[in-house]
């Protein structure tokens, strides 16, 4: 029953994102903390228009392309305490409330709560953790690749701490 409710939330979120005209090129609803939708990179400006109040993607580019994504975090779940070598990120809370911890080093600071519409920027190498609070949280994110010749991918995650032993 719980698995069905979880999958229903993911499918409902996927259909909502598709109803905005976005093409989902891949998805993963099997992460221990929730799941994600990867949006066609050619739709980065439309994604920014919809979720980031129309920030011009040229202003977001650091080195090369941008990669839009939707994160869905389960209640009472946490992504790993992590950072990236080849990307910065910009996030906007789309649905619900989430907790976020950020730090310039491996020390976890206090969690701050964010609500729908709040925007968060993460620099390359900045430690961060997304936390699901009392309900599902949905976050729109754009990867800002920092290495034009070697764009970031799902392997570009340095996990400092992980609740799931990864």
Residue ranges and their predicted role:
Residues 66, 86, 124-126:
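Short, surface-exposed coil-to-beta transition loops
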Residues 1-66, 157-166:
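A short, N-terminal "cap"/entry segment at the start of jelly-roll beta-barrel domains
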Residues 129-166:
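Double-stranded beta-helix
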Residues 69, 78-81:
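Short, charged beta-strand/loop "edge" motif centered at a coil->beta-strand transition
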């Amino acid at each position: 029953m719980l698995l069905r409710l979880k999958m229903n939330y993911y499918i409902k979120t996927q259909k909502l994102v598709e109803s905005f005209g976005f093409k989902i090129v891949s998805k993963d609803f099997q992460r221990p903390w929730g799941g994600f939708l990867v949006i066609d990179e050619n739709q980065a400006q439309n994604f920014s228009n919809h979720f980031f109040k129309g920030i011009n993607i040229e202003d977001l580019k650091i080195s090369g392309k941008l990669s839009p994504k939707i994160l869905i975090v389960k209640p009472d779940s946490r992504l790993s305490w992590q950072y990236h070598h080849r990307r910065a990120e910009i996030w906007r809370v789309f649905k619900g409330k989430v907790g976020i911890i950020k730090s310039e080093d491996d020390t976890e600071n206090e969690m701050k709560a964010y609500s729908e519409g709040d925007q968060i920027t993460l620099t390359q190498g900045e430690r961060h953790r997304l936390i699901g609070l009392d309900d599902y949280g949905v976050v729109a994110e754009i990867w800002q690749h920092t290495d034009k010749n070697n764009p970031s991918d799902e392997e570009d995650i340095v996990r400092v701490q992980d609740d799931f032993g990864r």
